[in-house]
Regions:
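Conserved beta-strand scaffold positions in the cores of enzyme catalytic domains, especially
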Residues: 12, 40-42, 108, 143, ...
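Electropositive phosphate-/nucleotide-binding environments in soluble metabolic enzymes
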Residues: 18-21, 25, 50-53, 91, ...
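Glycine-rich anion/phosphate-binding loop at the beta-strand->alpha-helix junction
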Residues: 36-118, 123
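C-terminal functional extensions of proteins
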Residues: 117-194
Length: 194
């Protein structure tokens, strides 16, 4: 986004769903140093942001009204807790976050976890965690962008969307984007998959 819109401001809101201190996130440090995020906001029990807020609502309002952000990215920091059960993972907070964005008049865009690197079947294609959030937790319709993969992988993703009726509940947007790796290299960012 920043590469094509360098004058736009991006705020990152870190929730308290994982590590609480912002400084533990090397990704945030790198993104801020590269000018890819302009301000940080920690909410709930998380701390160390440029701004600290009580909850997701005050965090979103701070991003828009005080930080003057054009785009707000919300995510937990490093680490995640999970119990191996359908509803027992801290990433379930994504549902309430998307609801809050919509309630405050924003445009909720849900980024699904999609991977083919993890050999566990439940993490092939769209992760079962993302499916749970989009099917059972979020109460509003959201935009879900899906990068177009090679046909076999894309067919798996489309099958999951249809099987869980996510294509009926939400706005699925297929994106032809071969620039992700190029953009990561351009900004000197290194990412890895579970």
């Amino acid at each position: 986004y920043k590469r094509n819109n360098p004058d736009k401001k991006i705020a990152y809101i870190m929730t308290d769903g994982a590590a609480l201190p912002l400084y533990l996130s090397m990704n945030v440090k790198n993104l801020k140093q590269n000018g890819l995020i302009d301000s940080t906001i920690t909410i709930g029990n998380a701390f160390g942001g440029d701004y600290e807020c009580i909850n997701i609502y005050t965090g979103l309002i701070t991003a828009k009204e005080i930080a003057k952000a054009d785009v707000v990215f919300v995510s937990m920091g490093p680490g995640i807790a999970g119990t191996g059960t359908k509803y027992g993972f801290t990433g379930i907070e994504q549902g309430q976050i998307l609801d809050a964005v919509k309630k405050l008049g924003g445009n909720p865009i849900a980024i699904p976890r999609i991977s083919f690197a993890d050999k566990r079947d439940r993490h092939q294609g769209i992760s079962h965690h993302s499916i749970t959030v989009f099917d059972k937790i979020v109460n509003v319709d959201v935009n879900i962008p899906i990068t177009i993969y090679e046909s076999q992988k894309l067919n798996k993703i489309k099958e999951q969307l249809k099987e869980n009726k996510l294509d009926e509940k939400h706005n699925i947007i297929f994106i032809e984007n071969n620039k992700c790796k190029e953009d990561l290299e351009y900004f000197g960012l290194k990412v890895k998959s579970m």
